[in-house]
Curated annotation (Swiss-Prot):
<comment type="similarity">
    <text>Belongs to the SHMT family.</text>
</comment>
<dbReference type="GO" id="GO:0004372">
    <property type="term" value="F:glycine hydroxymethyltransferase activity"/>
</dbReference>
<feature type="site" description="Plays an important role in substrate specificity">
    <location>
        <position position="228"/>
    </location>
</feature>
<comment type="pathway">
    <text>Amino-acid biosynthesis; glycine biosynthesis; glycine from L-serine: step 1/1.</text>
</comment>
<comment type="pathway">
    <text>One-carbon metabolism; tetrahydrofolate interconversion.</text>
</comment>
<dbReference type="InterPro" id="IPR019798">
    <property type="entry name" value="Ser_HO-MeTrfase_PLP_BS"/>
</dbReference>
<dbReference type="GO" id="GO:0019264">
    <property type="term" value="P:glycine biosynthetic process from serine"/>
</dbReference>
<dbReference type="InterPro" id="IPR015422">
    <property type="entry name" value="PyrdxlP-dep_Trfase_small"/>
</dbReference>
<dbReference type="GO" id="GO:0035999">
    <property type="term" value="P:tetrahydrofolate interconversion"/>
</dbReference>
<keyword id="KW-0963">Cytoplasm</keyword>
<feature type="modified residue" description="N6-(pyridoxal phosphate)lysine">
    <location>
        <position position="229"/>
    </location>
</feature>
<dbReference type="InterPro" id="IPR049943">
    <property type="entry name" value="Ser_HO-MeTrfase-like"/>
</dbReference>
<keyword id="KW-0028">Amino-acid biosynthesis</keyword>
<keyword id="KW-0554">One-carbon metabolism</keyword>
<dbReference type="InterPro" id="IPR001085">
    <property type="entry name" value="Ser_HO-MeTrfase"/>
</dbReference>
<comment type="subunit">
    <text>Homodimer.</text>
</comment>
<dbReference type="InterPro" id="IPR039429">
    <property type="entry name" value="SHMT-like_dom"/>
</dbReference>
């Protein structure tokens, strides 16, 4: 028998110290990694529920285990809320991650060796869009499209490439692209060559849910997303479609279970249901509007301080700063900003002369800072501090500037806590 008074702090103090340290790090650092966000206490409460004990292989009403009546309620709630949120008529909430959702799409609709055409990782795509080190580039024949020197997708070049390689699937979506993707044009290209259009909207799902970024559902055969980036929910994946093809829906369900996964994580599905309910609230749209406003405000400061922004701006939650002209690497910038308690990630930029582990840029995202209450004035000030640190790298005053910036960061983090 377990007592509810049991706690980690008493039982495993070494682990608890790591948890406490991470809690403190999140409160005392400014989080600008575009793929991260803060989950609400309600989402975390669902994740910590007793549903973690329940096995529920199968789908609602068609389980392989008994005692799933409440798991069915939870999963159906999540499905219906996701349908309402995105305008889908098919939803699978079981994928454990975005990568597993993508794997299920490939497995359900393709055969090994089929050709896929996705955005190159070096140009802003994702590992699972056909990178050679990923299953998507090992199991399938992956062709890659890129972006122009201006940081934009060239749809004419994409069309020509699609006609040349004749893919069975075109993959839309990105992990580091700051402009609006023309989903309609991508579908037109896919139709011309008889390909599926699959869109991974993991990075912009929250913006899509709020109506601020174009919804790919009306154009794609199938869409996937994570639930923890701009959506702000638990770590997990999601598959959606409104194509109306029941055969595709059956293939996708079978590719998730039993082909790709066993039992679903019911406690995480419960947390997804909470996240979708939160995203249906009126204040969620205001939050996402502020995410975009804050990203645009930061871009203007970087440009004023003579830092090149890839594509010269942003129409979503992220942007890339190209450091080539300043003689800096992304690795050095990431490290210096980290010492000042500002967390970003190094990122490749178009025609990057550096290796992927070094890079010549940084990726900056605003979902987390916006969720903890930063407004446009706050992020403009923050962008200025970041430029101060970047300007000082390798100079005599570097340590002094970093220390001064860290003090400012700690002060604003105290004023705007993540969890008050």
């Amino acid at each position: 028998m377990f007592k509810k008074s049991m706690n980690i702090a008493d039982y495993d103090p070494v682990l608890w110290q790591a948890i406490e340290n991470e809690n403190r790090r999140q409160e005392e650092h400014i989080e600008l990694i575009a793929s991260e966000n803060y989950a609400s206490p309600r989402v975390m409460q669902a994740q910590g529920s007793q549903f973690t004990n329940k096995y529920a292989e199968g789908y609602p009403g068609k389980r392989y285990y008994g005692g799933c009546e409440y798991a069915d309620i939870v999963e159906q709630l999540a499905i219906e809320r996701a349908k309402e949120l995105f305008g889908a008529d098919y939803v699978n909430v079981q994928p454990h991650s975005g990568s597993q959702a993508n794997a299920a799409v490939y497995m359900g609709l393709l055969n090994p060796g089929d050709t896929i055409l996705g955005m190159s990782l070096a140009h802003g795509g994702h590992l699972t869009h056909g990178a050679s080190v990923s299953f998507s580039g090992k199991i399938y024949h992956a062709e890659q499209y890129g972006i122009t020197d201006e940081g934009l997708i060239d749809y004419d070049a994409l069309r020509k490439q699609a006609h040349d390689v004749k893919p069975k699937m075109i993959v839309g979506g990105f992990s580091a692209y700051s402009q609006v993707v023309d989903w309609k044009k991508m579908r037109e290209i896919a139709d011309e060559v008889g390909a599926y259009l699959f869109v991974d909207m993991a990075h912009v799902a929250g913006l899509v849910a709020a109506g601020i970024y174009p919804n790919p559902l009306p154009y794609a055969h199938v869409v996937t997303t994570t639930t923890h980036k701009t959506l702000g929910g638990p770590r997990g994946g999601l598959i959606l479609s409104s194509c109306g093809d029941e055969e595709i829906y059956k293939k996708l369900n079978s590719a998730v279970f039993p082909a790709g996964q066993g039992g679903p994580l019911v406690h995480i599905i419960a947390a997804k249901a909470v996240c979708f309910k939160e995203a249906l609230e009126p204040e969620y749209k205001v939050y996402q509007q502020n995410v975009l406003k804050n990203a645009k405000a930061m871009v203007e400061v970087f440009k004023q301080r003579c830092y090149k922004v890839v594509s010269n701006g942003t129409e979503n939650h992220l942007f890339l700063v190209d450091l080539v002209s300043h003689g800096l690497t992304g690795k050095a910038a990431d490290a210096a900003l980290g010492k000042a308690n500002i967390t970003v990630n190094k990122n490749s930029v178009p025609n990057d002369p550096q290796k992927p582990f070094i890079t010549s840029g940084i990726r900056v995202g605003t979902p987390s800072v916006t969720r903890r209450g930063f407004n446009e004035a706050d992020v403009k000030e923050l962008a200025g501090w970041m430029c101060d640190v970047l300007d000082a790298i390798g100079k005599d005053n570097e340590a002094e500037v970093i220390a001064d910036t860290k003090d400012k960061v700690l002060a604003i983090c105290k004023r705007l806590p993540v969890y008050a």
